[in-house]
């Protein structure tokens, strides 16, 4: 899979798992995304896909590094619906 395709799949999964926040942006906790069986089967490197999406300003999260357990509470915010 290429990065563009994985980012598109990530957007779909964020929409599936997320809830709108007060700004009407879709938000998912990293732990929910990381522990989801469907996401585990789709993404070989979820954190790498999230980083690529963050660089493209498609998602936002307040951490440089995301680690399972440590950062499960971090919000992943969908900025662009692409």
Curated annotation (Swiss-Prot):
Pfam family, any one: Costars
Ranges that cross the membrane:
none
Record's superkingdom? Eukaryota
GO terms for biological process?
A: regulation of actin filament-based process
- PANTHER family hit by this protein: COSTARS FAMILY PROTEIN ABRACL
Query: What family does this chain come from, according to its entry?
Result: Belongs to the costars family.
Per its record, how is this protein called by name? Costars family protein v1g158749
Q: Which organism is it from?
A: Nematostella vectensis (Starlet sea anemone)
């Amino acid at each position: 899979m290429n990065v563009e395709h994985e980012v598109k799949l990530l957007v779909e999964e964020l929409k599936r798992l997320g809830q709108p926040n007060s700004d009407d942006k879709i938000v998912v906790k990293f732990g929910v995304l990381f522990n989801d069986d469907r996401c585990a089967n789709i993404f070989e490197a979820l954190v790498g896909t999230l980083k690529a999406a963050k660089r493209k300003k498609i998602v936002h999260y307040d951490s440089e590094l995301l680690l399972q357990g440590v950062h499960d509470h971090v919000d992943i915010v969908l900025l662009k619906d692409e």
